[in-house]
Amino acid sequence: MTGNPAAPAATSVSPPAEQPYQELGLTDDEYARIIATLGRRPSDAELAMYSVMWSEHCSYKSSKVHLRQFRDTPLTDRLLVGMGENAGVVDVGEGLAVTFKIESHNHPSFVEPYQGAATGVGGIVRDILTMGARPIGVLDPLRFGEADAADTARVLPGVVAGIGGYGNCLGLPTIGGEVVFDPTYAGNPLVNALCVGVMPVDRVQTSAATGVGNAVVLLGAKTGRDGIGGVSILASATFDEGGGPARRPSVQVGDPFTEKILIETCLELFDRKLVTGIQDLGGAGLTCALTETTAAGIATGQPGGMEVDLDLVPLREASMAAHEVLASESQERMLAIVTPEALPEVLALAERWGVLATRIGTVTNSGRLTVRWHGEVVVDVPPGSLADDGPVYERPLRRPVDFDLVRADAPTPARLARPRTGPELRETLLRLVASPNLCSRAWVTDQYDRYVQAGTVLAQPEDAGVLRLSAATGLGIALATDGNGRYARLDPFAGTQLALAEACRNVAAAGSVPIAVTNCLNFGSPEDPEVMWQFAQACAGLAEGCRRLGLPVTGGNVSFYNQTGSTPIHPTPVIGVLGLFDDVTRRTPIGFAEEGDVLILLGETADEFGGSEWAWVTHRHLGGEPPAVDFAREKLLGEILVAGSRDGMLTAAHDLSDGGLAQALVESCLRGGHGARIILPAGSDPFVELFSESAGRAVVAVPRAEELRFTDMCEVRGLPWRRVGVVDGDTLDVQDAFTVGLDELRAAHEGTLPALFGRLT
């Protein structure tokens, strides 16, 4: 079957009236480009397809010129699949590969918090499944407005319930993430989701539709009207001043049970080698899946093309129009390419699992994507024009007008009053550990099943989530996500590098070697030159940092238009890092569990409070420069942490970041159930020592018998270290400053979120 380049049938269904391309998010130039590409006016269905595929969400038209530099990050021997696929894949040894990726579902989660978050999890899980992997874990970096704001009370409980409800039903442990509160996210919550999966190295799947005559099979749920316009309206437009999109589409509705059996069906299809190509249906639904698989097939150099009959698509609503069927973002659907010989077996296997499977088309050699509806051709397009050859913009950049002023407003002692006496330091500590961004996340994480599948070794509140891949050998992985919008507001280049450095520190503190990076870049409108300058700086910072650390960027996501009216969110790059264990039994937790262990501070502390939690919590101040980043020192610190864990020299390790040494000590004491006696250097400023947020630091607990061996290693490698105390008792005692009991710390640390959002029953 071949398509007709002139496509007279498609032309015949185009209405004579002016087409509403601007309402669909297309510019005059883009509409003219479509006409030039087709040699005619597009049909309604074609116009809808171009509008979603050329949206910011699908085409990356404003970000692509900056993302290209990630391809220059190191291509390590472990990297099997890099940028451009549904998710990156790395070889972890023992015949296994791991795939991981982070995505956003920000705008839908504001409109419908439960379903927006739930389908965000479902979508990233299918991305991992599409690569051929069994999903084994989820992380959820979340950001909301002020903790006590009425809108946060509406959004946060629904988001948490949606993530927990969907992930728990799938049997996926939620092993990590973040919860951050800041007024910048009022009306623009960030709901990012990372999923990781594992597979045999020889089971990596491709999305390419190849093999003339092969069947195109739709698997999973029926198609309805939910989510129509999601990528072009929710994901590619700014909220108006009223807190919602001017054009409100329906948010997708998730069904985790259908997703679960779809996962098992696909994994069996992969194991039995019954598919030649596979693609999930996420943003832009069938439009995206059909165009990307067809374009990928043609890109292989083999004869390609596709003909599809929309009348064969199982519908939930019989009255749907062709463009609605193509644009629907109904969840729990996959598109498979199957040989005619394998088709009966595929259909029988799906029936056995209770999964709807329908042949809707055929791979052709036409070089075009042709779609029929009620006997007429409603789409006849070159698929590359939708999937690969859309508009690319090099938008203007302008450094924010207040950039220098904000950075000059440093939180110096002359600018912001600092605690000096022991009682003042004690009060500051209690206030910080109870603050929304530093308090316990148990109210959130207790709603997630962190240990289902029995593969979880460490989970929140640990520095990284750790999963066992092999019970026989102990092979395992660690994952962490980090981001700090305040740092990035002060300096998007340095702020992004700080997020990368912290995520690497987190997986190294757990005992694993960082091996790969993913990212979710959350920004305001790309039409704002100041936002685009921030974005360009963030991309450059991440690319340079990865080159310095020797880590590949395997893929990620860009989420633009996170703003209300003309006010964007702080630039918020969220960085995910994958770490590798030879043996997860050597992992290092954060808790101080052994009385008498020596506490050693690794790294150097400076007076660095720009963008700090202390400055915000005590003074509502955001200004100055963020902490400095030294990647050579970060890499050395990571190597020391991994060696100490591997060689049995550490009983606990915790990276230092928000809240500084004081926050890390509180978290480790409460996690392990033991107190600590701390001695600060003579002549030092206790406030700086306790609350500075200098990067490149960690606190470790070392058995006395291992102290000399560990410190000798630090000396030989050139890593600064200092003995700061000992694990002891049931108080946190800072010599000559203050003492506070663990019970008082626990009450302050654990009481905040239940007081704000209600106690869990």
Curated annotation (Swiss-Prot):
Pfam families: AIRS, AIRS_C, FGAR-AT_linker. The active site is at H57, H105 (proton acceptor). Mg(2+) 2 binds at D127, D280. Substrate binds at S104, H105, N106, H107, R126, Q252, E329, S330, Q331, S559. Pathway: Purine metabolism; IMP biosynthesis via de novo pathway; 5-amino-1-(5-phospho-D-ribosyl)imidazole from N(2)-formyl-N(1)-(5-phospho-D-ribosyl)glycinamide: step 1/2. GO terms for cellular component: cytoplasm. InterPro entries: PRibForGlyAmidine_synth_PurL, PurL_linker, PurM-like_C_dom, PurM-like_C_sf, PurM-like_N, PurM-like_N_sf. Its EC number is 6.3.5.3. The keyword ATP-binding applies. Residues 1-16 have a biased composition (Low complexity). Keywords: ATP-binding, Cytoplasm, Ligase, Magnesium, Metal-binding, Nucleotide-binding, Purine biosynthesis. GO terms for molecular function: ATP binding; magnesium ion binding; phosphoribosylformylglycinamidine synthase activity. It catalyses: N(2)-formyl-N(1)-(5-phospho-beta-D-ribosyl)glycinamide + L-glutamine + ATP + H2O = 2-formamido-N(1)-(5-O-phospho-beta-D-ribosyl)acetamidine + L-glutamate + ADP + phosphate + H(+). ATP binds at Y60, K101, N519, G556. One of its GO terms (biological process) is 'de novo' IMP biosynthetic process. It is found in: Cytoplasm. Residues 1-21 are annotated as: Disordered. CDD domains: PurL_repeat1, PurL_repeat2. Mg(2+) 1 binds at E103, N557. Monomer. Part of the FGAM synthase complex composed of 1 PurL, 1 PurQ and 2 PurS subunits. Belongs to the FGAMS family. Part of the phosphoribosylformylglycinamidine synthase complex involved in the purines biosynthetic pathway. Catalyzes the ATP-dependent conversion of formylglycinamide ribonucleotide (FGAR) and glutamine to yield formylglycinamidine ribonucleotide (FGAM) and glutamate. The FGAM synthase complex is composed of three subunits. PurQ produces an ammonia molecule by converting glutamine to glutamate. PurL transfers the ammonia molecule to FGAR to form FGAM in an ATP-dependent manner. This is Phosphoribosylformylglycinamidine synthase subunit PurL. It comes from Frankia casuarinae (strain DSM 45818 / CECT 9043 / HFP020203 / CcI3). The gene is purL.
